[in-house]
A protein has these predicted regions:
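Feature captures the catalytic ectodomains and active-site-proximal regions of enzymes
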Residues: 1-237
Length: 237
């Protein structure tokens, strides 16, 4: 699904719907790019609605882990989940790490390239409650499905883009009116509904950065390029 960003991709996994259908059927849960507030606050509700739609009356629980303490607590009580028909766990660490590489100098040093980034992630995983939970799931005979909502890419080259003040902020995709961009650098969608995306207004379009490009505004272009070059981003192709 495009964009390869959490608010679109992970909500789609839990709802079993395209973003366009989520907006139509569950406006109380769906938020578009400019809307204020968290964009992934209703994953549990989306999952419950999908199970209802599929006619699955099962015992299920949903957990979102955003720090070590909550992960450790769930791991310590993992055996209590054995009576569930379905247990869903969202583990946010890897996504948080990619954001930290942009914002924190110490993480930039530790994950200076793809090899170092993978090594840092592997080191975390080996010492995390997540590995403990996976091992316990095996011991308890659970059927275990591991997936992700999107990947990430080390962005090395900028591509200029111009948009109005309401254009979305993501560096690998943009949605808005009157977007100006380099055709060769993006996959452009003039009619978002054709790929299952909601349109903010009649003239809204989407563009998705290709390869290792990131989209940089002409205003403050040099600042954008120096700050975001060699950072891990997602949302594009």
């Amino acid at each position: 699904i495009l964009p390869t960003a959490t608010q679109y991709a992970r909500n789609a996994i839990f709802s079993g719907l395209t973003p366009l259908d989520m907006e139509k059927k569950f406006p109380q849960y769906w938020k578009n790019d400019p809307d204020e507030g968290g964009k992934n606050l209703y994953e549990g509700e989306f999952l419950t609605e999908q199970l209802k739609r599929l006619g699955l009356n099962i015992k299920q629980e949903y957990y979102k882990i955003t720090n070590f303490t909550s992960g450790k607590k769930l791991a310590d009580n993992f055996k209590s989940l054995k009576n569930n028909d379905l247990t869903t766990i969202v583990y946010n660490f890897v996504d948080m790490l990619s954001h930290a590489k942009t914002e924190m100098d110490v993480v930039k040093e530790l994950a200076s390239n793809d090899k170092a980034y993978r090594s840092l992630t592997a080191s975390w995983f080996k010492n995390s409650p997540l590995l403990d939970m996976i091992q316990q799931a095996q011991q308890l005979g659970f059927k275990l499905i591991i997936t992700t909502d999107h990947g990430t890419i080390n962005c090395k080259n900028p591509s200029k883009v111009i948009g109005d003040k309401n254009t979305s902020l993501n560096l690998r995709y943009k949605t808005g009116r009157s977007l100006t961009y380099e055709d060769k650098d993006v996959y452009a969608v003039k009619d978002p509904k054709k790929i299952g995306l909601p349109a903010l207004n009649m003239s809204s379009s989407f563009i998705f950065a290709k390869n290792d490009l990131f989209l940089a505004y002409v205003n403050n272009y040099n600042h954008y390029v120096s700050y975001y070059r060699n950072t891990y981003q997602h949302g594009g192709i």
